[in-house]
Swiss-Prot record:
Matching NCBIfam families: A_tha_TIGR01569
All ranges on the Extracellular side of the membrane: 35-40, 104-121
Taxonomic classification: Eukaryota, Viridiplantae, Streptophyta, Embryophyta, Tracheophyta
Pfam families: CASP_dom
Cross-referenced InterPro entries: CASP/CASPL, CASP_dom
Protein name as it appears in the record: CASP-like protein 1
Transmembrane intervals: 14-34, 41-61, 83-103, 122-142
Length: 157
């Protein structure tokens, strides 16, 4: 009976290892987005919070690799917090996207002219790259949050 319970543990361990890999990828992506967005306060703050959360959740992910069945509440808590971070990072990406569109095209009703016509095209592409990095980190966080498998654990009689 104990060998059957241990077989499920190896599957959970692979899920936890994949989750750790996704956390590291999200840390890299949010760090790049924070570095690229130094002028945009909201985007920097949101990605900084997400990066800090990901760094703080690494020990819990490593613990879940070593002991997959020890505390199932850890996985639930991480899943909920991952979804909160997805919402924050997505909000930052949307805010940066709106600023990008207004700066690029202007707004005729508000009598705003295009800002990008006064600068070279490289700064325009830098902001576009920032938005893509933020969206990429949001997608990685979303995939990480959906990675958790909820399955019924076999009870040992």
């Amino acid at each position: 009976m104990k060998t059957e319970a241990r077989d499920g543990g190896s599957e959970w361990r692979w899920v936890a290892i994949f989750e750790l890999f996704l956390r590291l990828a999200a840390i890299v992506s949010t760090s790049v987005a924070v570095y690229a967005a130094m002028g945009k306060i909201f985007v920097v703050a949101v990605n900084g919070v997400a990066c800090f959360y990901l760094l703080m959740s690494l020990p819990v992910s490593i613990f879940n690799i070593m002991r997959p069945h020890a505390y199932p509440a850890n996985r639930v808590f991480l899943n909920i917090m991952d979804m909160v971070m997805v919402a924050l990072v997505t909000a930052g990406a949307l805010a940066a996207g709106i600023v990008y569109l207004v700066e690029k095209a202007g707004n005729a009703r508000a009598s705003w002219v295009s800002v990008w016509s006064q600068f070279d095209s490289s700064s325009c592409f830098a902001v576009l790259a920032l938005i893509l990095h933020v969206l990429l980190s949001g997608v990685i966080l979303y995939k990480q949050a959906l990675n958790i498998k909820f399955k019924k654990l076999d009870s040992v009689d």
